[in-house]
Design a protein with these regions (language model features):
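A short, active-site helix/loop in glycosyltransferases that binds the activated sugar's phosphate group
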Residues: 115-139
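Structural beta-sheet core signal
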Residues: 7-9, 84, 120, 142
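Active-site donor-binding segments of glycosyltransferases and PAPS-dependent sulfotransferases
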Residues: 3-74
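Active-site proximal beta-strand in glycosyltransferases
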Residues: 64-66, 76-95
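Short catalytic/ligand-binding loop motif for oxyanion handling, primarily in non-cytosolic enzymes
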Residues: 15-18, 73-76, 91-94, 127-129
Length: 142
């Protein structure tokens, strides 16, 4: 029987903010041969970067996918066999009314509709997320 391939997607490293990436880079050696850690090719939130990252995620998706960091939108490429871990809500939803609306849909509503599981790192983030996005009634936050 073939082992299931798990892919953990992390955002592209940024010098000013990379603690999550450092943690996963340290842990990957303990997770087994069937787990692969992939850094996305583009940073930032430009349309071009988002499209390239979604395409990359689709091309490299595994049997099980874990999205961590602030790139939840790549669930549009990984599909439903995805776990999204949300570390922070408020830092993503910034800007004017139009920007906030787009980010809520692209970073939260659409990915959370697609992903099979969603985890948050704290009760505060669970509350923040529940207040700002639409969640399916049967979708539980871990």
């Amino acid at each position: 029987m073939r082992k299931r391939k798990t892919v953990i997607f992390i955002r592209k490293k940024r010098p000013e903010a990379n603690s999550i990436e450092e943690i996963f880079n340290s842990l990957i050696k303990y997770l087994g041969d069937d787990v692969e850690l992939l850094e996305l090719p583009c940073s930032g939130a430009s349309i071009s970067a988002i499209v390239k990252n979604i395409h990359f995620a689709r091309k490299h998706r595994g049997d099980i996918n874990h999205i961590t960091g602030e790139v939840h939108y790549i669930a549009l490429g990984t599909g439903c066999r995805t776990l999204i871990t949300i570390h922070d809500v408020q830092s993503i939803i910034r800007g004017g009314r139009i920007a906030k609306t787009i980010k809520k849909w692209l970073w939260f509503n659409l990915p959370l509709l697609i992903a099979r599981k969603v985890s948050v790192i704290s009760h505060l983030q669970k509350t923040n997320l529940s207040c700002c996005v639409l969640l399916r009634k049967r979708k539980s936050l871990l």
